[in-house]
Structures are given as structure tokens and as C-alpha cells.
Amino acid sequence: MDFRIGQGYDVHQLVPGRPLIIGGVTIPYERGLLGHSDADVLLHAITDALFGAAALGDIGRHFSDTDAAFKGADSRVLLRECAARVKAAGFTIQNVDSTVIAQAPKLAPHIDGMRANIAADLGLPLERVNVKAKTNEKLGYLGRGDGIEAQAAALLVK
């Protein structure tokens, strides 16, 4: 068996006038994440972890932020396409563990929905998908509420 571990990271700036979408869940908040697509920081980190584990590059290689085709793209669609490409390369996704770092809003009420979306998009049982939420203890740009960051790890097997 060939086991592969991938690590993913993403960060986006919080700005007025955009919806806040994390893990495919629209979260009520006065600001949203700035980006070419829907800027779903969590799904972007997971997508990078999956592509990385399969040695298929990163999200930008597959879904460029300079390509008009991905303007406003739903990151759940991108995650499903990523999973299809990883599977086409001969891998099976085993699990995903992730962390979202945001000073605000509180994400705990939305974690179950995020996990359900990710599990559905990757074709995994819910118990193989984890999402954690942390603050940055008011330190740095995250602590000031200027942005939201996500980190993810994924295990693949061939």
C-alpha cells in the first residue's frame, strides 16, 4: 500500500459586501472573504491537501484565479472535481482533518454543516472528516479580524 499525506493552507481577507462561506456553509456576518471564487478558505485548504498528497500540484494549477471560468466559482464544485482527479490518479481518500482560524464570527454552530458538506463532496463517511475552529487569541492580522485562515491534512492510499 502507498500511503500519502497532504497538507493544505489558505487565507483570505475579510471585506464588506461579500457573503461569508466556509466549508460550503453561508455564515451570517457583516463581512465575507475576498477572492476570485467564493473564497471558501476551508475548502481551498482541503483541496490543496488532496492535490498535494497525490503530487498533483495545488489548487492554483488546476483552478487558476486568473481564469474567468472560475470567477465566482462554488468551491464545493472545485472540491468535487479535485476528488475526482485524485481518484483518477488511483488514490482513495481516507480522511481529512482541518482547522479554521478566525477571531470572529464564532464557527462552532456551523461545524456540523461544514463536516456534512465535505463528507458528501468527498464521498466519505462523516466520521472521516473533522473540522476544528480556533481563534488567534487577538494576535496579528487574524486576531484583528482582518482575515480568516484554514489548514488541512489529508490521507490518501493507493
From Swiss-Prot:
GO terms for biological process: isopentenyl diphosphate biosynthetic process, methylerythritol 4-phosphate pathway; terpenoid biosynthetic process. It holds the Pfam family YgbB. The keyword Transcription regulation does not apply. Gene3D superfamilies: 2-C-methyl-D-erythritol 2,4-cyclodiphosphate synthase. 4-CDP-2-C-methyl-D-erythritol 2-phosphate binds at residues 10-12, 36-37, 58-60, 63-67, 144. Keywords: Isoprene biosynthesis, Lyase, Metal-binding. Its EC number is 4.6.1.12. Pathway: Isoprenoid biosynthesis; isopentenyl diphosphate biosynthesis via DXP pathway; isopentenyl diphosphate from 1-deoxy-D-xylulose 5-phosphate: step 4/6. PANTHER family: 2-C-METHYL-D-ERYTHRITOL 2,4-CYCLODIPHOSPHATE SYNTHASE, CHLOROPLASTIC. Homotrimer. This is 2-C-methyl-D-erythritol 2,4-cyclodiphosphate synthase. It comes from Burkholderia vietnamiensis (strain G4 / LMG 22486) (Burkholderia cepacia (strain R1808)). The gene is ispF.
